Amino acid sequence: RYQVPSRFVPKVVRVKQSFPAGEIYIVTGPHYLYYMLGEGQAIRYGVAVGAEGLNFRGSAMVGRKVEWPSWRPTQAMIEREPEKYGPLADGMEGGPNNPLGARAMYLYRDGRDTAYRIHGTPQPWTIGRSVSSGCIRMVNDHVIELYERVPVGARVTVYS
């Protein structure tokens, strides 16, 4: 079983007191997601982020949450890599080989689905890299833990 580097294992860390509990902050450069606990503490998780030019930036909210989500490539993904994504255009049921992994939190802005997600991955070796089509990937065990903590409506801010 693959072990992520120790710096990407979830860890409680100190943060500024001003960060409200229950919010998520993602810093793409060092590949970290912070779930704010309040009182100057957060849980820091290692993540994979979008490849150059594909990152989500700014603020959103968790619009919905799904266990073992189904997946369908976006039209932009199919156009960018037709040989890879074309055969999957009709989508894929949830399960251990699904690109969204064990859980997905769907990011919404202004009441609309952005098509970006915080989700698990069947490829944990990608954590710490900028390789996705823009989503925030987490180790399945880590995203399951975060999913249990985060309510629909939680604010998410991504800094690049």
What kind of region is each of these model predictions?
Residues 1-80, 94:
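Cell wall/extracellular polymer interaction/catalysis modules
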Residues 19, 51-59, 69, 80-160:
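Exported/periplasmic cell-wall-interacting domains
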